[in-house]
Structures are given as C-alpha cells and as structure tokens.
Amino acid sequence: MISDESDRFNPRDPKPADAGKPSKSAKRREARKLATQALYQWHMAKHSLNEVEAQFRVDNDFSDVDGAYFREILHGVPAKKVEIDEALKPCLDTPLEELDPVELSVLRLSAWEFMMRADVPYRVVINEGVELAKVFGATDGHKFVNGVLDKLAPRLREAEVRANKR
C-alpha cells in the first residue's frame, strides 16, 4: 500500500492561518470586559457614550475584541436602562442607587444580554456576569451577581430556563 505523505503532520509546516487567534467567544468576553469598564465610566463620569467609546478605542487594543459587540453593549445598555432597571428591582434586596457601581454595571450588561441577545444562552450570560464581577467587583461581588442573575434568568428567559431544567 502506498502511503500519502501529504496527509501526515509535519512540525515544520507553518501553523494554520487561524492558529493563535482568539475564538469568537474569547473576543466577546473581551468585549464584555471593556464594555463593563466603559459603562462604569459612563455611569460615574456622565460623559456621552460617543466620548466614552472613542476614549476606549484609543486607549485599548481592540485586536482581540469583538468591537461590534462592545459597541452594541455600550450603546444598548443605556438605551434600555429603564427597562433593565425595572427588571432588576424585584431581584434585589437593596435599592439600585445603593449598589456598588461596578456590580450595577455588570448586572445591567447581563440583563441587557438576557433581554436583547437570545442567541447567547442564559447560562453563558450568568457565567460571564459572574466572571466580570470576579475581575472588577468587590471581594464577594460575584456571589451577589450570581444570586441576582439566578433570579433574573427565569423572569426574562422563562421558556429557556424551564427547558434546561428537564
């Protein structure tokens, strides 16, 4: 039998074109991180969204970031702020105004994803929110965020949550 040498692995061959490039989910994770920081800045400094976005695009390397998703979050969360806050209130034991601004930014981003991005599974939304709170929030902020998002998911994604509990 004749073997086909061309099908064998050759360590001297160049890597595939996409080797070492971040995946779509990794780029979205980076977009969420930057969006959390940008939403915090928008909330605290009261700059316009366009100013915040421009500053973030100048100050950060977007090569490993889903820039379109960053922009969608950054402009989408404030556009839905009233609806997001109304959805969050029944899941909180504390008034919104008393929440840590970082955790509030994470909760708003996650609530926006629940509402506007049905293509992102609810468990991914919760996990990403918890991870953002671990990176940017207070010591146990991720536990608080997890608890709120666990209450919020069935309110905003009832059918999906029910289907996943079977």
Curated annotation (Swiss-Prot):
Organism: Pseudomonas entomophila (strain L48)
Family: Belongs to the NusB family.
BP term (GO), one: transcription antitermination
Keywords assigned by UniProt, alphabetized: RNA-binding, Transcription, Transcription antitermination, Transcription regulation
Top-rank taxon, per record: Bacteria
InterPro entries: NusB-like_sf, NusB_fam, NusB_RsmB_TIM44
The protein's name: Transcription antitermination protein NusB
Region (Disordered): 1-30
Highest classification ranks of the organism: Bacteria, Pseudomonadati, Pseudomonadota, Gammaproteobacteria, Pseudomonadales
